[in-house]
Structures are given as C-alpha cells and as structure tokens.
Amino acid sequence: MATATSGSGLHLEAIDRIGSIPLVESSVKRVETIYDKVKNNNRLFSWYFETAEATISAAYETIQPAVKLFEPSIQRLDNVMCKSLDILEQRIPLVYLPPEMMYWNTKEYMSDHLVRPVLKRADSVKQIGNAVLESPLTTYAAERIDGAFTVGDKFVDKYLVPIQTDQDQTDVKKLVSALNDNFSPIRQQLNRMFGHKSPQEDDNEAVPDERGAIKAIHHGQRFSRKLKRRLTQRTIAEARALKKQSKEAIHVLFYAAELIATDPKQAVQKAKELWVYLSADEPENQARPATLEQLIVLLTRESARRVVHLVNFSAHVAANIPRNLAHTTTEVAHHIIYINHRIITISRLDKVKTISKEEAESLFKRMLAFYGSLQGLTNAYLERVASFLSGRMEAEKVTGSDGGNSNHRSSRRRQDPNHYSATHNNINGVY
C-alpha cells in the first residue's frame, strides 16, 4: 500500500495505480506532448513556464514539513483509494485495456445491443407503418391534412407573392438547394421506410397515382419547400431594401455635414424647417407600410417626432416655471397672511398683536441706536489709528491748543446721544 520514501517526500501508491491505467497514461502523455510544444514555441512561453515550474517546486519543498504532519491521514486515504481501485478492477476490467481495445469493444457492444435492435425495430415499425397507412382512419386524416395544405398554399400565394428578379431567383435557388441538402437524408429515410420515391422538385406539381397518407406527406414536403422559397425571397428583398436605405442615409449624413461646413445659415434653416415639421401632430389615416423599409422609415420618423414633442413640452414647462413659482409663492403668502389674521381675530389677540408690534419696533430702534454708536466709536478709533500712522500725532503735540479743540470736538461728537431712529450715513469716518 502507501509507503514513504526518504528524501523524495510522501509516496502514494494510488496515484501510481491511477497513472498505470492505459487511458490515463495515454492522456497524460498527450498532455505532456502539448505542454512541451507550447513551452518550446517561443522564448517568452519557455521563460514563463520555467518560472512557473520553479515556483511550484519551491512551494512543494516549502510545504514538505507540513505534509509530514499529515502523513498518517494521507496513508489511510491512500489505502481507501487502493481498495476502491481493486473493486473497480474486479467489476470493470475493461478500464485496464488499451484505448484501441476499449474503442473496438465499445463499438461491438453498441452494435450488438443498440444498432441492431434499433434496425429490427425500424423494420417492424415500417411494417406497422404500412399497415397504419392503409387503414381507413389514416386515409381520412390524410385527406383532411392535404386539404389544410391546399388552404396553406392559397394563403402563401396571397400574402407571399413571388419576386420575379433574376438575381433574386439565383440567390433563392442557392439557399433552397442548401436547405434541401440539409434535409435530404431525412427525406431519403422516409422514402426508404414507406417504399415510395420522392415527388418531383418542381414548384407545386403533384406526382400522379398518389393517394392517402403518401399524398399528404408529399404535399407537405412541397408546401414546406414553397414556403421556404417564398420566405427566402422576401428576406433577400427586404435585406436589399435595407442596404439601399442605409446607403441613402449615409449619403444624407454626408450631405448634412457638407452643408454645415459650407453654408451654416442654410443648414440652420433646414434644421428649423425639419424641427417645425416634426413639431406638427402626427397625420391621420396614414397608409400602412407595405415593406420593411417603409416600416422602418415610419418608425424612425414617428420616434423622432415623439422626441421633438418631448423636448418642446419640456422647454415650455421650463419657461413657465418662474412665473408659476412666483404666482404660487404669492398665493401661499396671501393665504398665510389671511390665516394669521383670522386666527388673531378669532382668538381676540389684537392687544397682544399691538404689544408685540410695539416691542418689535422698540427692539429694532435699540438695535439701530446700538449700531449707530458702534459705528461712531469704530470710526473714531479708525481716525486715531490713521492719524498715528500718518504722523499727525507729532503735529498734535506741537499745536496743543488746536489738538485740544480737535479732541474736544471729537469727544463731543462721541458723547452726543443718538436721538434719531435711523443711523448716520458714516463711512470710514467721512461725514
């Protein structure tokens, strides 16, 4: 079982036994071959993989001491895996055969147990199918299905009119031939099962001397080919129309860019005309689009019209916002004033209102007086600082009398009470 080798780390017998399985061994060799090819492809890959190998080796050497701690548990796991491999070898010995032998054995087993029973069952189904096809109930159902296909042919001729164009016919023949090549094995298998040949590959002509279920099956095949052919023609025509429309759109864009670069005024005029056209309401009783190109043009035009209407509506709303806001604010203010007046009238708070008004006016007057005195004091100090900085203090010392009178006037100006409700218009000491 599991044995430990000195100097090379822990050795697992289960890994060796799994590697000795032919299928695993061949897979490992194949992977090694691919790895060597990728590694030796160029120098960058070689350096990258060598660095990765060195890193993995260093990591393996680093974790060796930690692995030694779990050696008993790993050995028990190795024993369990070896016992599982013994059971696998006893029950499925095919696993230890070479891959080629496994392939041939599997092929023989599938041939004996799957393919031949299926072929036998298909033969019996063929016989049962012939019996079922000849029953009256099947004949009745086939007639009804054939009638449904006939009605389907009429609808196809009405709504999917063939497009008579040489290039279209060439492309349609190529696509239909490709589709018929894809479905030909199924058709051949059905013909072999029911013992009849396929109908002619014409448009919609029935093969003579047909009846019952075979006639319904062949009619369904013709209807399927016809429907595929008409749908392919219509798809190609719509694709060409879209291609043509795309070219025209690109030409229009180039013309618009050239017009903007050469004549901006005319470009602006064209843009205004287009905007006015798209700003109009959608016309009523429009003709339904007959082709995909017309449908795309209609959807594009109406989508642009919706966008223009949205932009116009947003601009109108944005332009009316200031006026509406002012009107709403005025209305709210009037309502608030009216509500306050009603509350005061109902609560009989007229005296309180008058007292509050007088107190507010008195407080406002005191604030104005304090502000005026503060402004005068500030102006005086600013004048003294300015005089000190300009050297006027020396002049005041020499001319004491003039300075005394000036100081007396300044002190008188500072001590004069403010008997007015409004403040003086004093700015930085200038009166």
Swiss-Prot record:
InterPro entries: Perilipin (IPR004279). Keywords: Cytoplasm, Lipid droplet, Lipid transport, Transport. Residues 397-431 are annotated as: Disordered. GO terms for biological process: lipid droplet organization; lipid storage; lipid transport; positive regulation of triglyceride catabolic process; positive regulation of triglyceride storage; protein localization to lipid droplet; regulation of lipid storage; triglyceride mobilization. Residues 418-431 have a biased composition (Polar residues). It is found in: Cytoplasm; Lipid droplet. Its main location: cytoplasm. One of its GO terms (cellular component) is protein-lipid complex. It comes from the Eukaryota. Required for normal deposition of neutral lipids in the oocyte. Belongs to the perilipin family. This is Lipid storage droplets surface-binding protein 1. It comes from Drosophila melanogaster (Fruit fly). The gene is Lsd-1.
